[in-house]
């Protein structure tokens, strides 16, 4: 059941949630991967929310905050 039928909202893994609602894109994207934290435009509305969720995720995983900050800096340098 991993492969969803075409034309369904579950396609957000390939489209990075661009078609989905705001909360779905922000939640699923930020918690599962950092793709939404590398927006195409510098003034992405969810950028700070992504950073916050990444830090929360790091806290849940038991990672020190400075490690998460380092990861965020590395992701910021990549365009």
Curated annotation (Swiss-Prot):
Residues 1-12, 28-37 have a biased composition (Low complexity). Residues 16-25 have a biased composition (Basic and acidic residues). Residues 1-47 are annotated as: Disordered. It comes from Eimeria acervulina (Coccidian parasite). Keywords: Cell membrane, Cytoplasmic vesicle, Membrane, Merozoite. It comes from the Eukaryota. The keyword Cell membrane applies. This is EAMZP30-47 protein. It is found in: Membrane; Cell membrane; Cytoplasmic vesicle, Secretory vesicle, Rhoptry. GO terms for cellular component: cytoplasmic vesicle; plasma membrane; rhoptry.
């Amino acid at each position: 059941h991993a492969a969803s039928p075409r034309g369904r909202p579950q396609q957000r893994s390939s489209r990075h949630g661009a078609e989905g609602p705001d909360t779905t894109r922000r939640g699923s994207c930020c918690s599962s991967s950092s793709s939404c934290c590398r927006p195409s435009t510098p003034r992405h509305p969810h950028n700070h929310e992504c950073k916050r969720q990444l830090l929360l995720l790091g806290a849940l995983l038991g990672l020190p905050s400075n490690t998460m900050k380092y990861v965020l800096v590395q992701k910021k340098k990549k365009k």
